[in-house]
Amino acid sequence: MLHYAVVFFVIAIIAAVLGFGGIAAGAAGIAKILFFVFLVLALLSILGGVFRK
């Protein structure tokens, strides 16, 4: 349990450094693009599974 606490603490510190360092704006733009790319891929995968049967 202590291992997970340390891992999450390190992740929180990294997120804080990136968030307060100004990198968040660029990462948010990339995240929006990736969201729509993976949304389209998920829909294609679902439709492929439906029509395959």
Curated annotation (Swiss-Prot):
Keyword Ion transport: no
Compartment annotation: Cell membrane
Annotated Gene Ontology cellular component terms: plasma membrane
Pfam families linked to this entry: DUF1328
Keywords: Cell membrane, Membrane, Transmembrane, Transmembrane helix
Membrane topology: Multi-pass membrane protein
Family assignment from sequence similarity: Belongs to the UPF0391 family.
Name of the protein: UPF0391 membrane protein BP1737
